[in-house]
Amino acid sequence: MSGTTTGPSGAASGGQLEERIDLSKETDQKIEQAKQLVDSNQLDEALALLAALEKRCRVGNDNQSLVRVCETSLALCKQVNNEEALLQTLQTLATRRSQKTAAIKALVQTAMPWCVDEPYSPKATTTEQEKAFCNKLVVALRDISDGKIFLERERAVLTRVLATTKEQAGDIAAAADVLQEVHVETYGSLSKRDKVEFILEQMRLTLGKQDYVRAAIVAGKVSRKHLQEENMEEYKIKFFTLMTNYHRHDRDALELAKDYHSIYSTPGLVLSDEAKWMPALQATVIFLALSPYGNEQQDMLHKINSDPNLEKLPECE
């Protein structure tokens, strides 16, 4: 086929390599034309020009040019602050038939900084209109990322942002429900730390919703073994602090003693700071004393009795 090359775009149906048409020069020219049209207050004409080019790049398997066209289309809408056009362009380009993975990912990653402040906060806004647009953009990007493995990280971030927005509006139940939609433990592209942090947020909001049955289920997704690893101390403390809330509701003194002892025994962040380890050890002793007699309670009692820090605790009156 004249004017075509076999590129790195992968195999098409039937195992044949897709043919790639190099549209880089045409893309350079038409992007420049589109920018000039926008400078002349002709956004619709610029988007129409780029839409036709987007199809040629997509059908011609020129992914590099396709990504540039998609990014430019969104950027031009943002440049003139046409929020309606931006949302529509985003939706249209992301849902094109046989749209390339690279294009969808580029669209989402281009738009996210306009509604997200790293790492998981909604974009700071000064007007209600800006706030409403950011909320719409977060929802649109979440919808686009739904079910796409290559956008797992982005979907997790967007979900955290949406939950934060709802929590700030005072709707804890809705915030908890939003986070529960994402089974982050199955996301292969997220690090262990990212997964644990997300699950801890699920726990916090579920407890805030006072759904203790769900909170227990979510807590079961956290590997205690992972919490013992290096650089996980912060998450270990957060986890067992949340568990104290759960076990207080459950009125389980022995589990509370174990929770506080897990906090107390965290190296670095707790054991090196008397202001932190002393309250944790004191709570351990109190709840252990309130625990019903049993083998586990007695074993833990003997272990605590041999701790030299016990002598540093103030007497309880």
What function would you assign to each model-found segment?
Residues M1-E317:
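Extended alpha-helical scaffold regions
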